[in-house]
Amino acid sequence: MARRGTLREKISLFTVILTISITSSFLYAANTRGGNLMELTLVDVDGKKVRLDQLAGDQPLLLYFWATWCKPCRITQPKVAALAKKYKDKVKVVGINVGGLDSPKDIKKYLSRNRITYTMLIDHNDEAVKAYSVSAIPVIILVDETGKILFHDNEPLANLEKFLSG
């Protein structure tokens, strides 16, 4: 009997380790696909297709995932706009509207009302959400020119400015 308990414990431990290993490798792969992440094609508020790598040029991209109906996003948005101005020579800020609930017309109204001038894209099919493992909004992700994630934070501005100025 004692031997069976030990075997069950070993099997349970093996299962836990295997689960953690598989989950970790999935999350790592999702966030380190190199150039593939930059090859995503989304649409802008006018319906024009835009590839992320075309926007970046030789600068990193600061991707801001948000939605008009998201209250925390409304609080964060002015801070992101300030970062876009302050670090315009270091990074290109791109807003990515997610969730599929906002129409392009609603997004344009929101941008105009809030005087948002940085590039805005729409992720209708959650391609970017999946590629960048976005689980909640608002979130900011800093990606270098090759698609490597440099910064990924669900509490968007806590450490980002320190990271950008360093």
Predicted features and spans:
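Bacterial N-terminal signal peptides that target proteins for export
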Residues: 4-14
